[in-house]
């Protein structure tokens, strides 16, 4: 299954708000239906603390990750709309627009 990995800097002091948002998202009644509808089989979010600040690392296992991102950015369903709004408020990233950087490059895969 194709994988998409992304890293986004977390603005100072915003990690608790991000964690709270994800706790709420995890319990959203539409989460399973929404993720499956986008072809996502697994999605993980990780926080890496660094001296330069926290980083959010997202990993998506999806049928077609780039189509999934496009569909997510245009969806009018409750969960994607709410997710985009929260991510914009917390991280300053507008997921209704094209990604601000090119996709990550895979440089090692084992086995």
Predicted regions and their residues:
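Amphipathic repeat-derived elements
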Residues: 21-33, 42-46
């Amino acid at each position: 299954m194709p994988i998409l990995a992304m890293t986004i800097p977390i603005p100072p002091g915003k990690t608790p708000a991000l964690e709270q948002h994800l706790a709420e998202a995890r319990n959203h009644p539409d989460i399973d239906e929404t993720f499956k509808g986008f072809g996502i089989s697994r999605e993980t979010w990780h926080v890496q603390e660094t001296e330069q600040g926290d980083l959010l690392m997202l990993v998506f296992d999806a049928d077609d990750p780039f189509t999934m991102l496009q569909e997510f950015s245009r969806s009018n369903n409750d969960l994607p709309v709410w997710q985009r709004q929260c991510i914009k408020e917390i991280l300053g990233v507008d997921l209704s627009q094209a990604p601000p950087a090119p996709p990550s490059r895979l440089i090692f895969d084992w086995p």
